[in-house]
């Protein structure tokens, strides 16, 4: 029988409190009770008897405006905020204990990283002192510097100078890294201790927080948030004042420090300084700011709108992909595994420095002790590689894919911001982009990227606190980690599909039945389920990159070892960068025909030094012909010309030793971070260098002339000698693009014996004046010339008379003989590749020439400054009809979209309406389909194919928009289930946030004092340690945006859009997550305490 139909027992009375709450009076015992006496007949007595969401006798659910839902146990007269029906609190305790184990491992790994860095710093300081002493002793005698072997790097003045600068830079960099790592260690140590105390406190408290205790915790949290808001305002004021101070200093990146060199180093380079000019012969390559004529105004608007809508769709797709990846990730768990890989990398760097350290002035005991430490370190590294799990590699691949998606999202947001400003400035009469009714608007209700959806930069919210928007490693560390785990994955690289992340080592997740979150929390699993693929078309083991941009995954393809940081097409990148080669024409270049690794002739551009001496080793090498064809997927061997005899220049033994060894190198310049990347991929046909048995081979790379304060010399790890060696090592140099054009890349193949004596067998010198600024990666093969052969040629007697046509050496004779034929063949091949492989202008012009001409203008401006003669023979593709004097084909008349015939009834994304079918009775004209915009919804001039219902008395009569029915909202918005553990974590997190903010404010105040002192002393440039630190360079970049807001308006808008996109990804992740949102939120809260967010770096130590 229902309870309302049951009468109250005798002696009981129902009454109401002053706030309307019902209570019951027992007149017999003269007591009051909140429990209805009839409940003992209708309610279950224990939780075991409860069905569905019932509460047992004596329990009541109540609501507090501040705390939310809480529960009252009238039997014990206590309150609690945990739901007694859900064992979520117990699951939280288990998750916290498991995370403490992971955090302890990460902390111990980072402590070991700090110790290894300390050893590296000690070795670097010893090496710098020894090299500096050698330089001082040998500085006065140039003869003693070159009296030894010219192949020994320790006695080469240029290499020795680069060694000293590199050692100094390494010491300063290691000092800065140790200061930063020390602060990270302190943060993680405090966070670990905080989590440990929370675990102990919550384990002792059986009932958790009561209602009054929870209210007190929330009041304290709110007070700390107010203090954080005030601190953020103070921080912003300090940043503004620093921006004003920084504006008074000169921050030219192309200063003399980047171009620091001696006269000998400039003379030694066989590449001349490039001419700084713009080719304005036709006046069609000058990129303007969309200043089109009046007749192209409409076409320009349409083109920009199309690109704008396409970029918007790309951003939406990238956000969905990022949300899917984040929903499968464990926040904080990957950090410990990444730290272990970083530890392996640091040990490898230490091992490399132990191998290449100079043994001068070392006692025999010190050398033996160093050798023992090196062997012990080799064993540790081998054991660490053997224990690397497959699931770890898979998780790191997904993390690298996420970083790639974040980079694509940054590019897309910058493109949208630029297009938005261009559309606004193009015409004031076009439809406003900020209208909320437009489906493609920046401020639309769904997927908004506008600044209006952003919270204030000084407000404190838990979304900003726990979710770090797109935190990434720095570029150098990211490349090392990716190459490290990619190298470890080669041992078990499967031929078929790769298994999921946790398939082999983690229990699978049970599906949550029903839609209730309470039931989902009752069947919690400790690990999220991983998806096999994010797209039905994606293949994790595909040998070639996918065609769709939505599933681009270069790190999971066969080209991952060659392009760890790039996602564009390799063929397109190589072809585009090749178009920019060889434009100077100021140096006499010849073609050299040499047998390749497979016995096929190679084409090489080389310049022969006129003299013989120490500088003869600086031989410039260019890309071979076959390597370009191989990169494009088509291999065409160079035809051997009749009548050309190699015996005329070389004998049979020496012909294979000269120029036959090749090295594959990828070059890329990152314009955003001002960094130049060098990727040493592999070395082929090493036997041509006459290598001895049981020798280890490494490649030494030097950027000459060396900068005064940057690392400019690198060495790969030594490998056992073989005919083909695969290195896959990347090196990063911080340098400006104008300074890079003045540099030369010297590549040497060296061997090292047990006494740490380095001997160079062969090398090449590559000009960096042709590096693409657009960020395209160019991969090429370079031929290496043997130093032994060159020394032998130098020892031959030279003729005394002046050189003439009859008095040239054998190499020059061969070069002059083959130059004309090679040039002709190269011209034909380059023109065919240019027309067929990279540019597809004819197809685009056939569709819409007026739109395509303007669209290609923004994509070609990178390659218009220096164009090869082969590329100039191609037909003109961009034409300014008002200034160009060449005869060009007449362009079709620009027409409006409604008058242009279309081949298919598809509507562009810039149109809001559907396709309009022209009425047959309207006019006797052609009865074909056309596209138009309607100004009225009830227009009788044409008929909608799917006419929407007419709304009478509508305010907007231009078009009828059906508003979505507003969903019926509950009186209280649905809250996440919160426990005492959640409240405690929130309280400690706000305390940590406030403490970190206080430290950042103190660092900014100290930095302000340094700049004020430097300004008072009359200094014109910023301090050197401030310009060299990567983190402070980012801070200076942010200060530049604060000062020149008009100049960096698009960048600021892009930053706002990225923050909005991060919040959208966070929101979408909660929708796509297969687990309850409470689980993901709790993991973020735990990870916050062990993942430092240092936006303002600590001041570094004093440099050398």
Curated annotation (Swiss-Prot):
<dbReference type="GO" id="GO:0032587">
    <property type="term" value="C:ruffle membrane"/>
</dbReference>
<keyword id="KW-0539">Nucleus</keyword>
<dbReference type="GO" id="GO:0046621">
    <property type="term" value="P:negative regulation of organ growth"/>
</dbReference>
<keyword id="KW-0804">Transcription</keyword>
<feature type="modified residue" description="Phosphoserine; by PKC/PRKCZ">
    <location>
        <position position="970"/>
    </location>
</feature>
<keyword id="KW-0597">Phosphoprotein</keyword>
<dbReference type="GO" id="GO:0005829">
    <property type="term" value="C:cytosol"/>
</dbReference>
<keyword id="KW-0966">Cell projection</keyword>
<dbReference type="GO" id="GO:0048471">
    <property type="term" value="C:perinuclear region of cytoplasm"/>
</dbReference>
<dbReference type="InterPro" id="IPR001202">
    <property type="entry name" value="WW_dom"/>
</dbReference>
<comment type="function">
    <text>Regulator of the Hippo signaling pathway, also known as the Salvador-Warts-Hippo (SWH) pathway. Enhances phosphorylation of LATS1 and YAP1 and negatively regulates cell proliferation and organ growth due to a suppression of the transcriptional activity of YAP1, the major effector of the Hippo pathway. Along with NF2 can synergistically induce the phosphorylation of LATS1 and LATS2 and function in the regulation of Hippo signaling pathway. Acts as a transcriptional coactivator of ESR1 which plays an essential role in DYNLL1-mediated ESR1 transactivation.</text>
</comment>
<keyword id="KW-0805">Transcription regulation</keyword>
<feature type="compositionally biased region" description="Low complexity">
    <location>
        <begin position="527"/>
        <end position="542"/>
    </location>
</feature>
<keyword id="KW-0963">Cytoplasm</keyword>
<dbReference type="GO" id="GO:0019900">
    <property type="term" value="F:kinase binding"/>
</dbReference>
<keyword id="KW-0678">Repressor</keyword>
<feature type="region of interest" description="Disordered">
    <location>
        <begin position="429"/>
        <end position="449"/>
    </location>
</feature>
<feature type="modified residue" description="Phosphoserine">
    <location>
        <position position="535"/>
    </location>
</feature>
<protein>
    <recommendedName>
        <fullName>Protein KIBRA</fullName>
    </recommendedName>
</protein>
<feature type="coiled-coil region">
    <location>
        <begin position="107"/>
        <end position="193"/>
    </location>
</feature>
<feature type="domain" description="WW 2">
    <location>
        <begin position="53"/>
        <end position="86"/>
    </location>
</feature>
<feature type="modified residue" description="Phosphoserine">
    <location>
        <position position="887"/>
    </location>
</feature>
<feature type="modified residue" description="Phosphoserine; by PKC/PRKCZ">
    <location>
        <position position="967"/>
    </location>
</feature>
<dbReference type="InterPro" id="IPR036020">
    <property type="entry name" value="WW_dom_sf"/>
</dbReference>
<feature type="modified residue" description="Phosphothreonine">
    <location>
        <position position="921"/>
    </location>
</feature>
<feature type="region of interest" description="Interaction with PRKCZ">
    <location>
        <begin position="948"/>
        <end position="967"/>
    </location>
</feature>
<dbReference type="GO" id="GO:0043410">
    <property type="term" value="P:positive regulation of MAPK cascade"/>
</dbReference>
<feature type="modified residue" description="Phosphoserine">
    <location>
        <position position="141"/>
    </location>
</feature>
<feature type="region of interest" description="Interaction with PRKCZ">
    <location>
        <begin position="945"/>
        <end position="988"/>
    </location>
</feature>
<feature type="modified residue" description="Phosphoserine">
    <location>
        <position position="891"/>
    </location>
</feature>
<feature type="compositionally biased region" description="Acidic residues">
    <location>
        <begin position="841"/>
        <end position="862"/>
    </location>
</feature>
<feature type="modified residue" description="Phosphoserine">
    <location>
        <position position="939"/>
    </location>
</feature>
<feature type="modified residue" description="Phosphoserine; by CDK1">
    <location>
        <position position="923"/>
    </location>
</feature>
<comment type="similarity">
    <text>Belongs to the WWC family. KIBRA subfamily.</text>
</comment>
<dbReference type="GO" id="GO:0035329">
    <property type="term" value="P:hippo signaling"/>
</dbReference>
<dbReference type="Pfam" id="PF00168">
    <property type="entry name" value="C2"/>
</dbReference>
<feature type="modified residue" description="Phosphoserine">
    <location>
        <position position="919"/>
    </location>
</feature>
<feature type="region of interest" description="Disordered">
    <location>
        <begin position="822"/>
        <end position="949"/>
    </location>
</feature>
<feature type="region of interest" description="Interaction with histone H3">
    <location>
        <begin position="836"/>
        <end position="1104"/>
    </location>
</feature>
<feature type="domain" description="C2">
    <location>
        <begin position="659"/>
        <end position="782"/>
    </location>
</feature>
<dbReference type="InterPro" id="IPR000008">
    <property type="entry name" value="C2_dom"/>
</dbReference>
<dbReference type="InterPro" id="IPR037771">
    <property type="entry name" value="C2_WWC"/>
</dbReference>
